[in-house]
Amino acid sequence: MNLSGRGILLSIIASMLFALFPGYVLMLAPLDGIQIFAQRVVWSIPAVLLLVVLSGQSAVLLKSLQRLRREPLLALALPVAAALVGVQWALFMWVPLSGQVIDLSLGYFLLPLVMVLTGRVFYGERLRPLQALAVACALLGVAHELWLTRAFSWVTLVPALGYPPYFMLRRWMQMNAFSGFTFEVLLMLPLAIWLIVSFGPADVYTQSPQLWWLLPGLGVLSALAFGAYMGSSRLLPMGLFGILSYLEPMLLFAVAVLFLGETFNLAQLWTYLPIWLAVILIGIDSGRMLHKQSRRTL
């Protein structure tokens, strides 16, 4: 298998692993979403550090640590990045317990479109015709949701509007993805320990002995998903990597409807159809750009 084939396989594996989280979270009763978030942070650290060693990223991690010592502004920005991604982690752990995975998937469907607008507003990137049409379709879906419910789910808005500032900050930091992720998880550790010690249910391991292996498994699942995601990002052209990233919200939506029993009615369809069309248009546009770039390299 060539590098592109391995990259595609890793991207699909990453999306499938992330889509397993909602079902996995439901097995962690009696823990609530915040406790599951805290436990995920704690158990992710040994798994991520092991992944760093096995992937040969130890030297890169040390160089990033030295850079933090030399650049105080970077050291100040890293806790902000950790806070931004921590909110997303907490939401991802809480949503399955509240039965709002469909709303979360909509946020991830909207995210690429918000990123297109972010590039236009903050980086002066021009919208190509298909991108502009995609944004218009997405706005049509949003307008229908507002007309239907007179509101918009905050669960949808948090990933759609919360990730762009995080990505912008990470772009400014120019830090290796493995290093940045490792530092972010380590910075979340004090909060996680405080949440577990202060609010964790007493004798939870006695009441639910399966947590002895399910919680470490949560950390392993997080590390494997992240490792596959980062591996695919290094092996694939950015355009193809972006197109394949749309698989995750599709799988989340399917899991919510087919396995978690969340309802999806005809009225909601008219919110999702324009947004799905927008995602297809963005995918076509990215595919065209990828094809043009590949022809230039021939």
Model region roles, listed by residue range:
Residues L127-L146, P159, Q268-S286:
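Hydrophobic transmembrane alpha-helices of multi-pass small-molecule transport proteins
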Residues V41, T149-F152, Y246, M250-L298:
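C-terminal-most transmembrane helix of multi-pass membrane proteins
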Residues W94, L110-L130, M250-L269:
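C-terminal transmembrane-helix exit sites in multi-pass transporters
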Residues L9, S105-L110, A177-L187, A223-L258:
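Helix-helix packing/entry segments at the starts of transmembrane helices
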